[in-house]
């Protein structure tokens, strides 16, 4: 868990590209302010991690009666998330995108949906990629993925 917290903190706190025209403060020092207790530092890191994290939820074995009918994707943007979510499903063997959702606000879900492309009967290993965007600026803030199998029955 400490490694995960460290990786997340590094991703959130790493130096970003500077916008044109800004210069870094020459007298700035790396790290937390001197005199902070360990408890205060951990509390701040936990707050940053909570703000930057998001939950993903999707049926990892959705079934479709046939290649052009809706299937039970069960995509959910948890009420605890702070971000808009867009979900893309791609086939692992070809990299072909077979589904893209619209933006889901927190506490919204998609119970069933058709794939963007009809697939023949069979089981298809795929990956669902969740893209998290800020609601106000629609800036991409992160991605997460889930392995899945699309099951086309007929």
Which residues fall in each region the model found?
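A short beta-turn/strand-edge loop motif at beta-sheet boundaries
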Residues: 64, 77-83
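Beta-sandwich strand segments
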Residues: 135-144
């Amino acid at each position: 868990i400490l490694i995960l917290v460290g990786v997340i903190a590094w991703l959130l706190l790493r130096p970003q590209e500077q916008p044109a025209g800004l210069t870094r403060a020459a007298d700035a020092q790396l790290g937390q302010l001197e005199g902070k207790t360990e408890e205060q530092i951990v509390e701040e890191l936990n707050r940053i991690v909570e703000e930057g994290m998001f939950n993903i939820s999707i049926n990892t074995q959705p079934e479709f009666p046939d290649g052009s009918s809706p299937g039970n994707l069960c995509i959910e943007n948890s009420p605890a998330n702070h971000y808009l979510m867009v979900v893309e499903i791609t086939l692992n063997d070809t990299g072909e995108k077979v589904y893209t959702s619209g933006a889901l606000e927190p506490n919204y879900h998609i119970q069933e949906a058709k794939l963007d492309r009809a697939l023949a009967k069979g089981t298809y290993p795929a990956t669902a990629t969740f893209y998290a965007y800020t609601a106000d600026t629609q800036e991409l803030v992160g991605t997460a993925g889930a392995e899945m199998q699309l099951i086309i029955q007929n």
